[in-house]
Amino acid sequence: MGQKVNPHGFRLGITTNHVSHWFADSNKAGQRYKDFVREDIKIRQLMSTGMERAGIAKVEIERTRDRVRVDIHTARPGIVIGRRGAEADRIRGELEKLTGKQVQLNILEVKNPEMEAQLVAQGIAEQLSSRVAFRRAMKKAMQSAQRAGAKGIRVQCSGRLGGAEMSRSEFYREGRVPLHTLRAQIDYGFFEAKTTFGRIGVKVWIYKGDVTAKELAQQAASAPSRGRAPRRDGDDRGPRRENSGPRRDGGNLRSQRNDRNENAAVEAAPAAAAVATEGSDA
């Protein structure tokens, strides 16, 4: 299962969190759940168009009744902000026009872009679009991630690799990438490279380590207890039953069986003695 499913969705609530924070409980047009989901998709599409070189790793959206907060995590904040904040003002104006609400735009810098799977996938895709050999681009990205502190990385490219007539998939892996371990912090990214031969999909998995024991203890403390409630009398298991009482079947079956065997032996003794006497007379 862990080999197929998206690592972010597989670990929601364990090592990853939602990137959209809002709650929809209205049936009014424009405030329904499907309206907010459609709006989130349009916001992320707006962030991706024309901002390919900004290195946007993640876009988080939070909603209140009359305001929308958008957090942009980028490796190159200067491109997103623009000269004297002109680009940021343009983005804020387009978002307010799209949502119809006041927009709070926060631009956050990614401290370690070599450890962000989405940024690594974008970097490989840019090299493939520039006609760099796919194996060289994959291995270079893996070496950079390991130098940055990654415990494991896997990179996969799918498409007409090298301009081949038949499409195929190739992947390389360094270190450990435990996709089945839920406590493992797996970062996942996907990006498409546009080449003259067609599109090449790039997938990146980066293993950053397990959740610490302190975090596990905090989660266990905050989780509700699922233990059995104590019994009404005695300890948790309650008092032991006494063996002296009558059984449900009316008595001890083993003692009844022994009594029947003894009675049968007493009744059979005279008959056996008579048979022995007749044999001696003959």
From Swiss-Prot:
Gene3D superfamilies: 3.30.300.20, Ribosomal protein S3, C-terminal domain
Domain of life: Bacteria
Biased segments, Basic and acidic residues type: 230-262
GO biological process, one term: translation
One Pfam family this sequence matches: KH_2
Record keywords: Ribonucleoprotein, Ribosomal protein, RNA-binding, rRNA-binding
Keyword RNA-binding on entry: yes
Signal peptide: none
Presence of the UniProt keyword tRNA processing in the record: no
Subunit structure: Part of the 30S ribosomal subunit. Forms a tight complex with proteins S10 and S14.
Listed PANTHER family: 30S/40S RIBOSOMAL PROTEIN S3, SMALL RIBOSOMAL SUBUNIT PROTEIN US3C
Protein name per the record: Small ribosomal subunit protein uS3
Lineage of origin: Bacteria, Bacillati, Actinomycetota, Actinomycetes, Micrococcales
